[in-house]
């Protein structure tokens, strides 16, 4: 039986999974959500001996019901292969009494590889299924990691083109160089003069621009998205939470049915939403702990029920979380207001016009599955330093935010449930911040000179992704003002 997807702002608009992947965003600007959240047909015990690829198949077939087994397995095989430097794909590492789900073993050393390795294959399969003749233009805003992972995934994929926008001063040097050296005849990257929220809003506006869509169609193009607003990004992320639980079970760390807590460093709310979907699938997750940095708009939302983006935007050492408009929260809002598309639309309009909204007490009660915390810049650095001193384990800044919040939550609540932390990036990606936290003397060193030092202290070999950029040629130098994004896209495409 097919699982259909509908726009959260208009329940009458129903599409198949492959159509939702192609569209990215519904024509009314709403995000696609499953008509009903699926349940896994198998127990955790039955899945515990499966490898990552087979686990991903069991999870994704529940959501992508119009894909045949052959189509889905083919996408999975092409995605999760030797591009990953660990055959477990997402290894679970125990450090003291906490488990780190390392999601950074892919081609661009960030968790975005977990979904963006497969999205191009899901997209091209969807295009064939729906007899799409237009070239698909992937339009993406990035706070650092999505951009490179999407460019690497879509580079030279037939029938596609990708244009990435990133905030000029809002990414690390390594992240910027990763993007600006990306090869591929169908790849463009643009630095905007503004922050990530400007980039994301600009991309959304282009998706909703019907006149632009017509101009593109006349030239044989159509837009889609590689951001987590696309369900083709979100669904593959559900798989690794299922995999984490089954590995704990297989390793004898937990008993079947024993609940775990999951801590996720959160910016755009996609990664933690995937964990929420995993819980609904049947994974015994007790608490979903949302970890924020100094841009703590989500922490405040979970505390008060008011989402308010009217605040100073802080540039932190965990830039992938420097976000004040968390797009995927809209999907959760839709669920907690009883799938009321009118109410969801009303709240999103309020956010657009006033920059804030407040949920009802009844809706807030439905957030009991979540806990939230935040980590200041000092606490994040301490988290890296102390974990390294005690255990020798080196983590990146985003993972450190989650580790701090995990400790904070345990201390406040007394909850000793076993915790899995989503470890979202390699420390090599944020080498300056990581090495400065380990030893303050590194604060004035050149970022690239610190790479061999990190290898020395961590004992983890320098990833290929880093070696590749050290002597790579810069191929992209486009820049634009935030209000000129549409003109830039038209210029690139010759529209």
Residue ranges of model-derived segments:
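PLP-dependent amino-acid enzyme catalytic core
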Residues: 1-495
